[in-house]
Amino acid sequence: MSSEHLNWKSRELTESDDNIGIHAFYYGLGWQKEDFKKPQIGIGTPLHEINLCNMHSYEIGESVKEGLSEAGLLGYRFGVPSVSDNITQAHSGGNASLPSRNVIASSAEMVTTSHRFDGMIGLHHCDKNGPGFALALMRSNLPGFILSGGTIKPGCLNGKDLTIQHVYDEQAAVEVGSSTKGKLLEVVKHACPGAGGCGIAASFNTWGIAMEAIGLMPPYSSSNPAEGDEKRAECKKAGEWMLDILRAGKRPRDIITKAALSNATAMIGASGGSTNGILHLMALATEAGVNFGLRDVQKILRGIPVYCNFAPRGRGTMIDLFKMGGTPMLIKHLIEVGVLDGSVPTMFADSLAEQVADAPAIPEGNDLIAPAGHPYKPFADMQICFGSLAPDGIVFKVSSRLDPTFEGTAICFNDVDLLVTAVTEGKIQPGHVVVLRGMGPVAMGMPEVLVATSALSTPKLDGKVAFVSDTRVSGVSHGAIGVHCSPEAAVGGPIAYVRDGDPIFIDLLKGEINWDSRGVMELGGEFKAYSGSQIYLREFANSVSQANKGCVNKSLLSND
């Protein structure tokens, strides 16, 4: 793209006398004559003041806008809806979380393409923000990237760091009588001290480090804290990055290849990341038109050891990574140990290895990133299984188990509250495979059921039961968890037919999950598409694909 035509799209409006009425609006914005030849960049801003993850998004957007201006570009913030994955936990509001990702993608696509922007920067604040903007970039293929709003700093109580995970773990402890409400209240008051996304390897940070590994997020962006000089400096540099991208003529679809998606998968596995990251990668591959599915993910994760000790599997936070040297340091290490392919191009460099070349080496004796040849675990916490219970796949995360096999009998629930009650009443015992169904994308938007996994994380059950569901879990969850079971119950998937007492066999390294129906096939309840009063959920249910395709719009899929 020649330097004089960096406004490659907006010039349709700014350099044509046929659009004189539009020019009147531009002059009303305070433009001068020279502004009509400047590239216009949309800044996707998920405004949401009541959510800690997003409360500073307007200020982050303003800093990005200033950086674009310093580079001779015109930056304009535009708003998209955002749903807090924490505030919507444990009630029907959680049904909005995953649909919000698709709404963000459509909103950003609509605004940027209709206004003829020359590029887009999407701000990643809460879990579904960054994935939504990434999908929008695949659709429009506009020059651009995702920039993280930054991670929250840890809270502190009695000299010990706290995260949001401690709140849910303490809540579970109170429910089984091993802690007190007074102690829980103190943890609640001190766990979240300010702005930023959840500070552990939950969904927000999983997507951030995956996007750095895939080349769609600038170096250090995922690990820089939300409140700090580094984040503001990074925002100011956004203009320099965007100008380089425009001059080079780079487009997002140029870098979202099978090799890049493999890198993102390996990064999620090596870091002990969230299952939601895999769901979004499936969506990204589908939107980008890349032939990359759960079978590919299965093959990659089988060969990936766990190199990071982030919570919830360990104790580390993104602030710990930031203090050590940031995400580029981790990427550089994973390239050196053979987990990541350093040759893939990024939006910011000719190769990923070049992008992180100046990053420091991991410190000796640190307790966050394992040295070469000494991983924390020989196989990834996350594995993909197929079989009679999940013909199209299920995503497992088993941070609390070293044994890759599990055999147990089903205990089935069609309601998450009944599951939690069963835990408190002692009905769920070690050896059970807890089946929660009828909560998939078509049934109710595929909400996160952190309340269920928290209930199962008590000392009596943690690592001693398995959890299988057609819905999602929060990235702060831990235990033996299988989610995104495809097909879901609402479309007639086998999970709808499991009965209490049915044997279920899981072998993570073989990638198998099988179920013995004992010769009886009868529905375990009434499972159907959402038909309630929320219109956006009806629209989502009518248009959404299954989890193995990333829950994108069905119109993107071929008919075969």
Where does each model-flagged region fall?
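Short, surface-exposed connector motifs at secondary-structure boundaries
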Residues: 114-119, 431-433
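Short, well-structured alpha-helical segments in soluble
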Residues: 104-115
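N-terminal glycine-rich "phosphate-gripper" loop used for MgATP/nucleotide binding
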Residues: 101, 123-126
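Short catalytic-loop micro-motif centered on adjacent basic/acidic residues
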Residues: 119-122, 199
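Catalytic or ion-coupling anion/metal-binding cores of large enzyme and transporter domains
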Residues: 1-55, 60-81, 86-97, 126, ...
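Well-ordered mid-protein domain cores that form the structural environment of catalytic cofactors
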Residues: 97-105
